[in-house]
Amino acid sequence: MNISDIRGLSDTEIKKKLEDSHKELFELRLKLSTRQLVNHRELPRVKNDIARILTVMRERELQIR
């Protein structure tokens, strides 16, 4: 997910996306611990998505953009 895609979402959609990403990260960590995770590249991707979402939320809080 690109940061420009996130900026195009409303605040409620962003919060929902953040919640979904946290759930996905939890599930991926669970699969990793049970050795069921096939694509290890998914973990950093989800973490980066969460960071992007939090960045946009902070920008809106500070009214930077």
UniProtKB/Swiss-Prot annotation:
Superkingdom of origin organism: Bacteria
GO molecular function, one term: structural constituent of ribosome
Keywords: Ribonucleoprotein, Ribosomal protein
SUPFAM superfamilies attached to this UniProt entry: Ribosomal protein L29 (L29p) (SSF46561)
GO biological process: translation
UniProt KW Ribosomal protein keyword: yes
Annotated Pfam families: Ribosomal_L29
GO terms under cellular component: cytosolic large ribosomal subunit
Gene3D superfamilies xrefs: 1.10.287.310
Family annotation (NCBIfam families): L29
Annotated family: Belongs to the universal ribosomal protein uL29 family.
This protein's name: Large ribosomal subunit protein uL29
Encoding gene, per UniProt annotation: rpmC
